Amino acid sequence: MFRKRKPEPQARQAPKAAVKLTVAEKREISRILETARGDGKVHSAQDTLPFRQMYPDGLCKLDDHTWSKCIEFEDVNYQLAKPDDQTAIFEALCDMYNAHDASIGMQLSLVSRRMNREDFVKRIEIAAQGDHFDHIRELYTQMLRKQLERGNNGLIKTKYLTLTIEARDSKTARARFSRIVMDALNHFKVMGALAKELGGKEWLEMLHGILHPDGERFAFEWSWLAPSGLSVQDFIAPSSFRFGEARKFTMADKFCAVSFLQISAPEMDDRMLTELLDTDSGLLVSLHIRSMDQNEAIKTVKRKITDIDSMKIDAQKKAVREGFDMDIIPTDLATYAGEAKNILRDLQSRNERMFLMTFLVVNFADSKQKMENDLLRAASVAQKYNCSLVRLDFQQEDGFVSALPLGVNRIKIQRGLTTSAVAVFVPFTTQEIFHGGEALYYGLNATSGNMILADRKKLKTPNGMILGTPGSGKSFSAKRSIVGVFLNTKDDILICDPEAEYFPLVSRLEGQVIKISPTSTQYVNPM
């Protein structure tokens, strides 16, 4: 018989030493847990919108003592302008930024969103007039629809400047805004950009367009508030928000993501914003800009220079102790010292101010894959200019709220820049002309590729000339304009045609031809 052998007891593993956390780390963990638990209350989509009250005159109350106003401005032909004109626009932009002190917050918002498809198509359709040319009108409308699909006219791009101040009450805020807004409008006038102050309903309609990127119709009247018991947030809020994920969120049926621009380039290019906005999807770009007090900015730069000099001295002492030449210092220290001295010189002698800027980008898409592709495209544009587009982690709601054109900034990722460095983000590209009504088709914009529809009777100078080299299409352009006027308006068309070039066109349109020559039977009575 064999005695059963007892299994040998396994050696116990030594318990792992507990990781000791600092007080700051414990507080951070507690804060994250509190945020994850929430406050136990049921929240609605309206709670995300960061303002308390909107007044009919366009004054917005953000909290107890913070108020904002919004200005909409149109585009100018910056990319096609001469270098001297571009410099003038850049300098005017610098003057506008310098005119606002540290008590005024500025938010530059560039919005690219889809217009209501039905409204858009109606603007290019030619109404039937009950004659036997209606089939030509239908063919002409089909041609316009094809041209519409070639460009980005499904997207409308709008630009806004939101100004924010601190004030005790609405009366004080209105009194101060009257001067601030007037100065901003004058600066835009110098740049050649048409600008206007938004009323309360116009501001709400703009926010509704951002929160409903597919172009849903906006329906609201101030008289509806009291009987319905609703707030203005109820009329503009989307059906839902979902901020459960770390790096993206959903707004109704849209997939969205908020990123910030990490500026690491030594020099910036004025085409960056233009390329960033050149997309076929919804996009919201916001730049929060706030100037620093000039004396405080100079003191801050001087302190940085002192710190760098102290680091240089320590590096030189270490080099001497180790037997090296004391003039050999780390390259980064020499670079930082030179840049800091250049900034100090700009602040003291070149009429420059120091600004803190937060650059946010919000992408909207119909699917998760489309959103990721749009983010890659935007990141490649940033990489082209030696910058990085970084997704916000666990700050998507705060980032989206900060990107809305309301003047609220909850993202404290800021970059200090001088006036010239801020103004290089020029918000202008090319002026678009897309009138409705009796507007005529004049081709595609060479810069943006969008359709040009212009009603010259609405312009300051309705007269026009067609200029071009031989064979460039001057006659074709004139004939296209004649056909457009004939099909779309009830205007009279008079053609002086010494070479009888337009005779077949006039005959096809059943016009009247008057022949005047020494041998003709028709005459002009000079009396």
Residue ranges with predicted function:
Residues T461:
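Short coil/loop residues immediately preceding or within conserved phosphate-binding loops
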Residues K458, P470:
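The conserved Walker
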Residues K474:
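Conserved lysine of the Walker
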Residues F428-L453:
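N-terminal pre-Walker A segment at the start of P-loop NTPase domains
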Residues I466:
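Hydrophobic anchor at the beta1->P-loop junction of P-loop NTPases
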Residues M1-T430:
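Extended, folded cores of ATP/NTP-driven motor/assembly subunits in large transport
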Residues S477:
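Hydrophobic positions on the alpha1 helix immediately C-terminal to the Walker A/P-loop
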Residues N77, S109-F120, D134, E138-Y140, ...:
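Switch/coupling segment of Walker-type NTPase motor domains
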